[in-house]
């Protein structure tokens, strides 16, 4: 298990710009992996440079992201895609909706796949029957109904980019 003391994010929520989302969570606890310790204290720095303290803690079969000033609870599940790459499912428990993205966890740093959603949706990444919507800030987003096409698209995208070119640093380990 790894502990990290600082979590640096480029947005006010962990996966705000996730390209894939669903009305209900698609990843179950039985399919999840648990790459972090039971409790992690972090400092988040938003795009304006404002820092806040928070905690990522394991609560039974999922992680809970406790954020000061936020009433809604955010739960996280991780699933290893390959090697140090994980799919992340972020669920807003008040709404029941889920966002999906990918992280790379190395011995000393956690990276978030950072890109405009329109970059991931090309002819090879189209998910038949799913709904696409245009967002003014993040480009396209996809309402997904199955986890497998999300896994495949994220794996393809991760294999085609270098971390320093397309990933945001989320945290560092002491």
Question: Where are these predicted regions, by residue range?
Answer:
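Calycin-type beta-barrel ligand-binding domains and close structural analogs
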Residues: 20-37, 45-51, 57-174
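Bacterial N-terminal signal peptides that target proteins for export
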Residues: 1-8
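C-terminal motif of bacterial Sec signal peptides marking the signal peptidase cleavage site
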Residues: 15-18
């Amino acid at each position: 298990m790894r502990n990290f003391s600082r979590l640096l994010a480029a947005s006010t929520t962990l996966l705000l710009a996730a390209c894939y989302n669903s009305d209900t969570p698609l990843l179950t606890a039985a399919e999840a992996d648990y790459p972090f310790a039971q409790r992690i204290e972090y400092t988040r720095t938003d795009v304006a440079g404002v820092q806040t303290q928070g905690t990522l803690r394991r609560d039974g079969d999922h992680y809970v992201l406790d954020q000061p000033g936020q009433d809604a609870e955010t739960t996280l599940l991780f699933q290893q895609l390959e090697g140090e790459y994980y799919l992340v499912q972020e669920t807003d428990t008040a709404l029941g909706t889920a966002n999906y993205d990918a992280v790379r966890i190395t011995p000393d740093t956690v990276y978030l796949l950072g890109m405009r959603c329109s970059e991931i949706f090309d002819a090879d990444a189209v998910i038949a029957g799913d709904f696409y919507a245009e967002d003014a800030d993040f480009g396209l987003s996809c309402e997904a109904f199955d986890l497998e096409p999300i896994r495949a698209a994220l794996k393809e995208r991760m294999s085609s980019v270098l971390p320093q070119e397309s990933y945001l640093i989320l945290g560092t380990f002491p």
